[in-house]
């Protein structure tokens, strides 16, 4: 056996050992965000959507980390990946002493600190400003490992009164908005509704019952047909038929 064949056989044997060890090791899963350390690289190898960074196995994507001899991340389709500066929509899930816990549809709950409100709020009576179940249009101002902090200190942010909230795949949001807002303005004008689109895929619609339903159906059409050509024409036709 020549040297090249011997090296090839050794590589195959090493790969087989790693594969068998991975199968035999009991694997665990946990939700991770990009940049999060999953485990030490001392006893593990990076797999899909992970990397070795300074001796640690680190996640490259949002998803479920599967931890065995080889560590990989299974991406979760359609999950919202928060970024600083995003304007998003969420619902108050809990009222704390120093702020509100907001469900924004991501892997972690977000927090709106009391000091990020644009006006004075009595910390002993915070539910007068926002209570559990209230919908809010907020901005992401900080993203750290395992936490997202929000703010209301920008124009157009605040509590969303009445209406309905629907949810779409956040990756389809640009198609719903359209170039320079053309698509969403088309729907607003036709249905006579107020619409706020959150970059997390939550969309608030307010108008007459008929208008809200029609707007919701139009947005559902966009989500279904987002990969196809002639989308604007299809939406115009749909809206025209519903008059």
Q: PLM features: residue spans?
A:
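Single-stranded RNA-binding regions, centering on S1/OB-family and related RNA-binding modules
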Residues: 1-243
């Amino acid at each position: 056996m020549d040297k090249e064949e011997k090296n090839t056989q050794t590589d195959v044997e090493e790969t087989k050992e790693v594969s068998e060890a991975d199968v035999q090791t009991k694997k665990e899963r946990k939700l991770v965000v990009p940049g999060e350390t999953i485990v030490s690289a001392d006893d593990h190898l990076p797999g899909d959507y992970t990397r070795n960074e300074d001796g640690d196995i680190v996640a490259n994507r949002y998803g479920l980390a599967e931890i065995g001899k080889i560590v990989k991340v299974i991406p979760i389709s359609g999950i919202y990946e928060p970024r600083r500066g995003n304007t998003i929509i969420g619902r108050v899930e809990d009222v704390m002493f120093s702020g509100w816990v907001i469900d924004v549809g991501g892997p972690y709950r977000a927090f709106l600190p009391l000091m990020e409100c644009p006006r004075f709020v009595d910390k002993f009576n915070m539910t007068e400003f926002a209570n559990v179940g209230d919908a809010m249009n907020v901005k992401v101002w900080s993203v750290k490992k395992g936490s997202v902090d929000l703010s209301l200190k920008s124009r157009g942010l605040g509590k969303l009164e009445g209406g309905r909230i629907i949810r779409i795949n956040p990756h389809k949001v640009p198609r719903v908005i359209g170039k320079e807002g053309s698509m969403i303005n088309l729907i607003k004008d036709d249905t006579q509704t107020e619409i706020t689109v959150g970059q997390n895929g939550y969309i608030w619609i307010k108008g007459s019952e008929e208008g809200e339903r029609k707007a919701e159906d139009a947005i559902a059409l966009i989500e279904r047909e987002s990969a196809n050509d002639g989308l604007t024409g299809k939406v115009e036709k749909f809206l025209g038929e519903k008059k």
